[in-house]
UniProtKB/Swiss-Prot annotation:
This is Dual specificity phosphatase 29. Homodimer. Interacts with PRKAA2. PROSITE patterns: TYR_PHOSPHATASE_1, TYR_PHOSPHATASE_2, TYR_PHOSPHATASE_DUAL. It comes from Homo sapiens. The lineage of its organism: Eukaryota, Metazoa, Chordata, Craniata, Vertebrata. It comes from the Eukaryota. The active site is at 147 (phosphocysteine intermediate). GO terms for cellular component: cytoplasm; nucleus; protein-containing complex. Belongs to the protein-tyrosine phosphatase family. Non-receptor class dual specificity subfamily. Dual specificity phosphatase able to dephosphorylate phosphotyrosine, phosphoserine and phosphothreonine residues within the same substrate, with a preference for phosphotyrosine as a substrate. Involved in the modulation of intracellular signaling cascades. In skeletal muscle regulates systemic glucose homeostasis by activating, AMPK, an energy sensor protein kinase. Affects MAP kinase signaling though modulation of the MAPK1/2 cascade in skeletal muscle promoting muscle cell differentiation, development and atrophy. Its EC number is 3.1.3.16, 3.1.3.48.
């Protein structure tokens, strides 16, 4: 396959990737979004920002960072962080926990996950997303989501949050995060995010159909 053919196939794969929003429904746009494959998704990450520092803001008041950021209590306090989600919680990973921040005004949530393609991180998608959402519901809050490198586990949980609570497709979420930080979940996590994407897209389409049927019923 030539490079030109790759570009064309990728363009076709996600050129129609759109958020399934009521506005689009009203405007009559065709909902033809299809979850891209792992290779196409990885290309989206590669096209993102080369920026990779200890911590980056990827959504208002939502930051992805590394172990060094999480361990630096002074800088966390100075920067005004109020919540920490550790996606590498545990003795053999980033061993912090609530006690580590006990004398600080920080709420902690730990996810004991390994950065392995075989690890099922999806069971933590909704609890982690709920923690992030509660944090961001307060205008004065600021949350750090971290793992060891701030590239795979933490990025996966942030992507899941944007998909679940901000009604983004996986493509939307990747583009939002990748433009602000160089991240790349492992293939296993990408597969789990693809499954979440398919489920959420189906739910939104069902909801839109039901809303449309109810609207038609009121007009009769």
């Amino acid at each position: 396959m030539t490079s030109g053919e790759v570009k064309t196939s990728l363009k076709n794969a996600y050129s129609s990737a759109k958020r399934l929003s009521p506005k689009m429904e009203e405007e009559g746009e065709e909902e033809d979004y299809c979850t891209p494959g792992a290779f196409e998704l990885e290309r989206l990450f590669w096209k993102g920002s080369p920026q990779y520092t200890h911590v980056n803001e990827v959504w208002p008041k939502l930051y992805i960072g590394d172990e060094a950021t999480a361990l630096d209590r002074y800088r966390l306090q100075k920067a005004g962080f109020t919540h920490v989600l550790n996606a590498a919680h545990g003795r053999w990973n980033v061993d912090t926990g609530p006690d580590y921040y006990r004398d600080m005004d920080i709420q902690y949530h730990g996810v004991e996950a390994d950065d392995l393609p075989t690890f099922d991180l999806s069971v933590f998608f909704y609890p982690a997303a709920a923690f992030i959402d509660r944090a961001l519901s307060d205008d004065h809050s600021k949350i750090l989501v971290h793992c060891v490198m701030g590239r795979s586990r933490s990025a996966t949980l942030v992507l899941a949050y944007l998909m679940i609570h901000k009604d983004m497709t996986l493509v939307d979420a990747i583009q939002q995060v990748a433009k602000n930080r160089c991240v790349l979940p492992n293939r296993g996590f990408l597969k789990q995010l693809r499954e979440l994407d398919k489920q959420l897209v189906q739910q939104r389409r069902r909801s839109q159909r039901q809303d449309g049927e109810e609207e038609d019923g009121r007009e009769l």
